[in-house]
């Protein structure tokens, strides 16, 4: 009898798993879940811990044993999705960026989105001009250390904080100048609100880049934003497709297709190649979820989507959450006393924070920021200002950032991040999908921009300009096989987008090294 009880107790313990979720302020939340617990259960625990009601904008990220990143699906078992050995480690992050973050109902929600965008700025995912970078950093200073105080803030105080992958002494002085003269008296909530209003106007607001190749083998980054689908190449946003122009998303193996219907009933198919079939499926699922969230009027309109054609076996997926319009309507009905916000102050540091796969010590949730170590490539870039209208290819190089190797103030064993006035690639940031160590080197090759601003229809006219034999050889056998010619009817023509022409590059393959952020 006793042995049966002990055996049952043992089996019960085996069905419990420890989960650690890294929060946006770098603290950690640890809990225990049952073997059959769904993702929704874990997410609800987190939102209760954070006192968060406007929770539809957020999600939980994890990396599987093959180093592929995923968003946790709330309708499926947590344990079965992770497929790794416990204890499990995940991250709480913004999944759907609010189209207007300043319009969020509660301050706690705005604060969490502020923390996410601050991370995007630091990791190089949010790109901006030098003047905008200085203003954003000054808002962060005001929100987290308060008014300038000569007694507390000596000369060069802004240099002790890390806002970007790289920054220069000139930029540090500009940040301090704005903080001293323009922001005095602003509360943390006001500074965070102003930060959100400014960030929302930037071209790469909400961008979570997926590294791919176009049909010519050029590195590209695909992303989904509140406003539509974007393609980044080099230091430019080369294409933008509004959500109401996207008619279908599909993938087959490593090939991703985006179907576009624009004016005059022209139907176009954009084709890109992901590093792995798993990465392509992740890209497709992200696209399906973003399109449903931002485009649909109500969640009852959501349909199960197939990844392939009707007569071929493919993946099926259905977005399970509410859509943006429903979330806004629900938020308007929130009536409660504003929850207390435990803000995490900045920790002065001259080294880059890092997100690693190594074990972490447990901490009390929402405690002070931790210093972490991250390997980030150089610089920030400038993207041309845009009103989120038509897809374009730009040759503008105005007001950009320069990657600087080291500041004169740096110690011999200390790497200091610097920004000045040149350009950098999104590959320099911590990417959300697997990228080989060698592929970063390939992506960082300098780009040569040619051609004037053009629409997607104009791209069709340039389709005939195929790569030379030498360029095709450099791309390698795998890409040549993928890029064999595609046919199409008169009413539906497949268009291979060829963004800015790059210098000749050699195909180096893709790896699976990815940090958990």
UniProtKB/Swiss-Prot annotation:
Residues 498-517 have a biased composition (Low complexity). GO terms for molecular function: cytoskeletal protein binding. Interacts with CTNND1, ITGB5 (via cytoplasmic domain) and ROCK1. Its main location: other. GO terms for cellular component: adherens junction; cytoskeleton. Residues 17-298 form the FERM domain. Residues 308-353 are annotated as: Interaction with ROCK1. PROSITE patterns: FERM_1, FERM_3. It is found in: Cell junction, Adherens junction. It comes from Mus musculus (Mouse). SUPFAM superfamilies: PH domain-like, Second domain of FERM, Ubiquitin-like. Residues 388-398 have a biased composition (Polar residues). May be involved in regulation of cell migration. May regulate cell-matrix interactions via its interaction with ITGB5 and modifying ITGB5 cytoplasmic tail interactions such as with FERMT2 and TLN1. May regulate ROCK1 kinase activity possibly involved in regulation of actin stress fiber formation. The modification Phosphoserine is found at residue 375. InterPro entries: Band_41_domain (IPR019749), Ez/rad/moesin-like (IPR000798), FA (IPR014847), FERM/acyl-CoA-bd_prot_sf (IPR014352), FERM_2 (IPR035963), FERM_central (IPR019748), FERM_CS (IPR019747), FERM_domain (IPR000299). Residues 344-367, 385-408, 485-517 are annotated as: Disordered. Keywords: Cell junction, Phosphoprotein. This is FERM domain-containing protein 5. It holds the Pfam family FA. PANTHER family: 4.1 G PROTEIN, FERM DOMAIN-CONTAINING PROTEIN 5. The gene is Frmd5.
